[in-house]
Regions:
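Short coil-to-beta-strand
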Residues: 27-37, 157-164, 308
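Post-signal peptide N-terminal segment of secreted/secretory-pathway proteins
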Residues: 74-76
């Protein structure tokens, strides 16, 4: 049994949950403490977190530390999201927090944050696996942005981020002095404008039957976790023009919750109009639940019921399709690459994560040709770095992007391509994976899949690849 504390420094509240994790009984929440403070308000207005807000956070975190000591937790993790991620004084803020609390704060990339939210939903295995059998969208509304993840036949096929989070929208309306009478109309225009391109790109040929709502107070406001489309629209019409005080009394939630709930309702309403959603599921889970699930996963305290790596690969394949990459060429290259990787894994010090990164690089290695045939490598690098590959850290995404880039041009030295995210170890990983991709790509240079069978034989320090074909290679 392990006691684990998860702390989420969000845009409009700081939350700590204490979990009891056992291999037999799974994850059990035993305490939850939440403090309302709007870090995002400072950031989205001024571009940085103020000293007063930082000092208040330090006081709250020190209280959390005392609670953790009282429970004698075995481990803990502190994560910050978009407010800290976008703060211009991020480094100064993190240093001040560490010096005053002793806590090391991990600033999550958007993709890592949303993937953890996704894991929190997947922890409800029975409900989750049943729901995603039909077309499903997860709409994760945060203070700074929203993430929409689409599932088709129980696999994640696309995930996209838009900077229309509830706190950001609220601050925008307040700065423009919008009255409650015109609030919905103007906010709807802003959100619908963002959804217009999204619908054309991702919803054109998809039927979305279910909507899963994450990271918001709507479940607390409606006092249920499942709603039909008509139930939601009735709730929306009843709430949208009420004053904050009146709405708070109606929903039995604090008044300051209403100010961020109202923009969220507009986002959900606009998504319902863009997709033919039948049912809405509000599991009431937060980032802290995902942190506990990931901790249990990494420490092998739980048996996983969902293959998250396959979700990442499915999303990569969908992106490759969008950039008109050759599916048959990818299949041949991926099979060859995995065969080579498995043979040299031990001698090269690879791990399972490296295998996943190689497969993603193989799947996406042709995407740059969509932009430029003469400069495909550089184009592919920028495409991949701009992608929201949910489940990959920025560091891992940069590895994939560089492997694809240097598949077509000579690999430069570490002093030329090194960055703040790229360690020497990452550079060596790029070099090794690039070599594998270069070999397998050359074996199907014609894109005609002439190879019928391939065998890899490792003899001491030499890898021999035997190919069988009825045609000239």
């Amino acid at each position: 049994m392990k006691l684990f504390a998860a702390i989420d420094i969000g845009s409009y509240e700081v939350e700590m949950k204490i979990f009891q994790i056992t291999s037999g009984k799974g994850i059990k929440e035993i305490d939850c403490v939440c403090h309302r403070m709007e870090l995002g308000k400072d950031v989205y207005r001024d571009g940085k977190i103020g000293v007063e807000m930082t000092d208040e956070l330090c006081r709250v975190l020190n209280d959390f530390v005392r609670i953790m000591k009282g429970y004698r937790v075995d481990d803990w993790r502190v994560c910050a999201t978009s407010a800290v991620r976008e703060a211009g004084n991020q480094l100064v803020f993190l240093d001040r927090v560490k010096r005053h609390t002793g806590l090391e704060v991990e600033v999550l990339s958007n993709a890592s944050q949303r993937f953890m939210d996704y894991k929190s939903i997947a922890s409800r295995e029975n409900e989750f696996n049943r729901i995603i059998q039909k077309g499903t969208a997860i709409v994760d509304v945060g203070g700074g942005s929203i993430q929409i993840s689409l599932f088709d036949k129980d696999r994640l096929v696309a995930s996209q981020n838009m900077k229309i989070g509830n706190l950001r929208l609220r601050e925008r309306m307040m700065n423009e002095g919008v009255s409650l009478k015109h609030y919905e109309t103007l906010l709807t225009e802003v959100v619908k404008n963002e959804f217009l391109s999204y619908k054309k790109l991702y919803l054109k040929d998809r039927v979305i039957s279910n909507l899963i709502v994450v990271g918001d107070h709507i479940g607390d406001a409606v006092h249920k976790n499942v709603m039909t489309r008509s139930d939601f629209l009735n709730f929306y019409d009843d709430m949208i023009y009420r004053s904050d005080e009146d709405a708070a009394g109606r929903c039995e939630v604090p008044e300051d919750v209403i100010s961020v709930l109202r923009p969220s309702l507009v986002v959900y309403r606009c998504f319902l109009e863009a997709a033919d959603v039948e049912n809405i599921w509000m599991p009431g889970l937060h980032l802290t639940d995902g942190m506990a699930y990931e901790y249990a996963q990494q420490n092998r305290l739980l048996k996983l019921g969902h293959d998250f790596d396959e979700d990442i690969l499915a999303a990569a394949r969908n992106a490759a399709k969008r950039y008109q990459c050759s599916k048959s060429h990818i299949k041949v290259c991926e099979d060859l690459a995995v065969g080579i990787f498995d043979k040299i894994k031990k001698s090269q010090g690879f791990d399972d994560r490296d295998r996943l990164l190689l497969r993603i690089a193989v799947i996406l290695h042709g995407c740059g040709k969509f932009i430029s045939l003469s400069n495909a490598g550089e184009s592919a690098y920028h495409i991949i770095m701009a992608m929201d590959i949910i489940g990959l850290s920025e560091e891992e995404k940069e590895i994939v992007a560089n492997v694809v880039k240097y598949n077509t041009v000579p690999l430069e030295g570490y002093d030329k391509i090194g960055s703040s995210r790229m360690t020497r170890e990452n550079y060596l990983t790029i070099a090794k994976l690039t070599a594998i991709l270069g070999v397998v790509n050359s074996l199907d240079r014609s894109h005609k899949q002439k190879t019928k069978e391939a065998k890899q034989i490792l003899h001491e320090n030499e890898l021999v690849i035997q190919l069988y074909s009825d045609e000239d290679l």
